[in-house]
Amino acid sequence: MYSTKLKSPIADLDVKKRSLLFAELAEIAYKKKTEATKSAKSLGFTTVEYYNIAGAQAYRFMNKDDFVIACRGTEPSEFNDIKADLNALPTRAETVSFVHKGFKTEVDKIWPTLHEDIEREADTRTIWFCGHSLGAAMATIVASRCTGSFECPNPAELYTFGSPRVGFKRFVQSEPIKHYRWVNNNDIVTRVPMWLMGYRHDGERMYLNTWGNVRKMTGWQRFKDKMRGMWRGIKQGKVDAFSDHSMSGYVSNIFLWSEGKENPQN
């Protein structure tokens, strides 16, 4: 059961509560439509639309105030998702510069339908974007198109969790809306594609340390914290780089932060 219950527009929430809401929606995006609809309605959304076109998947969660696009992330059992992740060649973006070809291809599949829905339904609503893993990359490209390639009413913010690098420097610097980019310690997906290929991150890094607590750190401090997390994972018999990518881990840690609490450091 999710903890958020909207009683007013999303914009009325502070960044902690918004981060939790979008983490929960990014997790809900992995569910089948019946279950996702039930979960989304428990959060305060009245209508749910599921896009599933040639293996590319996303949800639209909507109420009278807000329009949320939540893109589904990589599912290990779906060959289409794995193929998209691996197709890391750069290709020309619809807006500016270059993006990851596999991620763009997934967005291209759902974009015509999504574009129509935005033009029809979003005129009086605030638009938000979120996603985890592959879904984070897709949400980033969708947000860029919504505000860069056509007149998109009322765009608000982008929330990504465990996002890979999506585009080249000029693309990410042209990102037109506020982006909160959540990174859980050693999450391996946040390290690919390699920066040597020209790909870059952008947005405000929201870093969860070894114990899952939000911290502002320098690059050197993050390096030491990642080494600490890796060693802690070894002692617990797990591979930290993979376990840190779990969406449920993001949700539970952000929930504590939103409540003004922290995980114990042990």
Question: Which stretches of residues belong to each language-model region?
Answer:
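Non-catalytic, mobile gating and regulatory segments of ester bond hydrolases
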Residues: M1-C130, L134-N266
